[in-house]
Amino acid sequence: MSVVAAGMALGCARLGSALTPLDHTQSIALLQRAYALGVRHFDTASIYGQGDSERLLGEALAPYRDRICLASKAGQLLTPRQALLAPLKPLVRWVAARRQHVHQRVAQARAQGVPRCFEPGYIARSLHASLKRLRTDRLDLFYLHSPAPEVLEDAPLFARLAQLQRQGLFGVLGVSCDDLVLAQRAAAHPQVQVVQFAFDGGALSRAVAATLERSGKTAVLRGLAQWRDAAAPGDGDAAMVQGLRQMLDLPACAGVLVGTTDAGHLQHNLGAFQRALAQQEAA
């Protein structure tokens, strides 16, 4: 499926993680519910849930593979401690749900960040591993996951990525960015066709979107939560719809990324998305 027509994207960073409130069965049900509600763009990464996010997506969405946009990322690694504790994740999840201090320690450890590797061989191996976990032979969208700016100048890496793309292992190359400076550099890279970044409505985020538009490239946007959190009591989802309108009005916008593990929250976001689309069409 074309990423350009994907609409709202479900971010799956929390699926399979030690702190997710969902077990395996509930995670599968959430993904299938998302598909039933009309979500066709699913965003994950090799590191999410120590690979379990991809495994869950592969299991839940295999029957619909040709009808969805499947995106994943490579470049971040588990720490040695995370790798050691991965088999104990069900126990950690059970304890963290019942002991607040354990939950806090796990959350603090996650917030410290992870190692990164963008060596060509590692990225190729990571892509192949993701395909296996996702039960597919190709990705629609393959991101470099929060690289340092100098990674965008790594000619051997981009030569290897071009080779993998020619082999049909992924359709479109993107960069998922942690900041707008990196997003602007990624938008100008000749091989990068999609940039994922947090849109805040400010001048720099609009400049990134404008660069993408001029180059015929697209953006997948994060950041919707800032409008939701800024809403005044009694405003309902008006602020969220306003934020969505700002995103959807950008010609480069190919999708808005929303992460949730709650089916009700997902349905609410989709309702706001549809209202924003209706307002845009009526304008």
Predicted segments, located by residue:
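Surface-exposed cleft-lining segments at the edges of enzyme active sites
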Residues: 112-117, 144-150
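Non-cysteine beta-strand/loop elements that form the S-adenosyl-L-methionine
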Residues: 5-7, 69-73, 95-103, 141, ...
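CE4/NodB-like, metal-dependent polysaccharide N-deacetylase domain
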Residues: 32-35, 122-142, 164-167
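Short, well-ordered coil/turn segments that N-cap beta-strands
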Residues: 2-8, 38-40, 64-68, 136-140, ...
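Beta/alpha (TIM)-barrel catalytic core signal, keyed to glycine-rich beta->alpha loops juxtaposed to Asp/Glu
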Residues: 26, 31-32, 50, 128, ...
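Active-site mouth loops of central-metabolism enzymes
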Residues: 13-25, 109-124, 232-237
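N-terminal binding-site loop/beta-alpha segment at the start of enzyme catalytic domains
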Residues: 1-89, 250
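Alpha-helical membrane-targeting segments
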Residues: 78-113
